């Protein structure tokens, strides 16, 4: 009845939203994005929804801030390999083969399926270690969307798997059937059509590499171009791919025998670290241990001859790590409390579910105002937190309680500063906006045990809880028994 009074809908076209088409880089690949004319009302609604969402750091990595030239130190003393990466005189990353567990990440095995669990959409695979590894349906080599694990795998079936995450605590290693071979400049993925380029590279360089990859990509293989490929010529990239294809052919030929059996083992940890990290931004590579110097030099000469000039043998009487105070910095990295330059401090606590980092002003009293003091302390903390995450190799969910700031502008500046510091980290991170409670939530890819887990044991007294329950209950029961016995005597 009252329909005639219903307000008619007027759709106005926004002149600002003209039709356009542009090519952008997304997840290492070129994509074409079209935007057209839309109504003003829907345009504003879309912007409101967009503003209400959390922003992920992965979408647009900020440029890596300028840092002092890096150094890499490798020591082979004591029958084990130890590697330190320094920015200036500060230790930022540490790797060792002397820890209680050796990383298996990257190793390829012929495994045997022990259990198929449809309820978990996963299978447990025996691959030669004490604990079986877990293989999720999405990681099975021939898996498709909505595939069922029970349709892909059977009990006692032999399957080629690769370790992508070491066993931690009660959890076994995580496995994948989608095998990949990392090289100096490329990652080769057999039986795949994947083509990707590192998002850390500038657009112009990604365009150059994209043209090269279209020419040299082998049929039946996927390739991912790494950050180290920046400025590398076509011949070097082709050589890297050819070496990786040879590795795959060896694995294919050796894929025989009785499972479980190791098929392909990753190289020594020093070679892995050089492969993943060493680049033109390093000013020196010092190697302590005569017989290993020639091996490393030969590897670099084959893969990155332009870095030959930075390699040096260290033969001084004073230990290499002692000269650069590496062990002192490692000991500090195992502490719960971390002091900041101006007197503030961090408290870092690990739990089964996540890592919590609390920021405090401590001895820092500032000069101008409370707001400025808190702001400066938070900026110092953001830089140190990013370094501690790398040094301690902390992964998983991380929650940071910065000191509260009322200024929204300064909150944004703090978050941008933190993201810039994280851009130095090769491990993938995702950062959310500051929550309503003033917390910064983030994740960091968890691949292997961190520094503390590698060089510590669970306390026998408290079973890792960090506290011991008082004996008040047992004492009360003793007193009650004594009182009862006295009553009986009377």
Task: For each feature predicted by the language model, list its residue ranges.
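OB-fold/S1-family RNA-binding modules
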Residues: 1-97, 113, 154-346, 351, ...
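Conserved nucleotide-binding/hydrolysis modules and their immediate coupling elements
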Residues: 96-100, 110-113, 118, 139-149
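Short nucleic-acid-contacting surface segments enriched for D/E, G, S/T with interspersed K/R
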Residues: 106, 146-160
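A short macromolecule-binding patch
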Residues: 131-141, 188, 240
